[in-house]
Amino acid sequence: MNYLKSNPKALGAKRVILLEVAGAFHTEIVSSAKKPLEDTLNEIDISKGNIPVYMNVDAKKVEVSTLKENLVNQIDSSVLFNQQIEYVNKDIDPDLWCHIGPGNVTAGMVRKSISYKDLKVINSLESSK
């Protein structure tokens, strides 16, 4: 990783940012969690909501018919973050984006993708006001 961070052009990138994460999520290391999740999801009913949801497993708007499968596949699939932002921007064209969660790295990635829009970062109770 240090090599890639020092040589981002080896990936065809401008720069490489290491994200601090709590686990090896979205990798084959956690694939064993797929079956228990699938079993649990098969026990519940999921109906269509009123708010569109986009998943980073395929970056597209979720259909109820594929939601459970997408949730299971998201465990060990790559995150299509930039594509997800592009689809939301194209489909919905929101005036305001809210980034909810710790840190600012992904908020910065969103900001660069939608630089002409408002972005509110909520990473604490205080910042939600």
Language-model features: where?
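Short amphipathic alpha-helices in soluble, non-transmembrane regions
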Residues: 1-11
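Residue-level signal for well-ordered alpha-helical positions
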Residues: 7, 112-113
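Structural alpha-beta junctions
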Residues: 12, 80, 116-120
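Acyltransferase
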Residues: 14-111
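Alpha-helix boundary/capping detector
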Residues: 34, 114-115, 123
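Short, flexible loop segments at boundaries between secondary-structure elements
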Residues: 118-129
